[in-house]
C-alpha cells in the first residue's frame, strides 16, 4: 500500500482518516468501526463492501 495514497484518500462514510492494516490487507476507519478490503492492492472504498470491526478490533 502506497503511504502517499493514505494521505489523500478518506473514509467514504465519514470522510475520516483511514489506517492501513497490512496483516489483513484492509483500510480501517476507527470512527465508523469499518474495514475496507484491498483487492490486488487496490482499495475497495464502497460502504457495502466494508465489514464491521469486532469489539476487540475496535479497541486496538
From Swiss-Prot:
InterPro entries: Trm112-like
Family: Belongs to the UPF0434 family.
HAMAP family xref list: UPF0434
Name of this protein: UPF0434 protein YcaR
Species this protein is from: Salmonella arizonae (strain ATCC BAA-731 / CDC346-86 / RSK2980)
Top-rank taxon, per record: Bacteria
Gene Ontology CC annotations of this record: cytosol
Pfam families referenced in this protein's UniProt entry, alphabetically: Trm112p
Signal sequence bounds: none
Entries under Gene3D superfamilies matching the protein: 2.20.25.10
Amino acid at each position: 500500500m502506497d503511504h502517499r495514497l493514505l494521505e489523500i484518500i478518506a473514509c467514504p462514510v465519514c470522510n475520516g482518516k483511514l489506517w492501513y492494516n497490512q496483516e489483513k490487507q484492509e483500510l480501517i476507519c476507527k470512527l465508523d468501526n469499518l474495514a475496507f478490503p484491498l483487492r490486488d492492492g487496490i482499495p475497495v472504498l464502497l460502504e457495502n463492501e466494508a465489514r464491521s470491526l469486532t469489539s476487540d478490533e475496535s479497541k486496538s
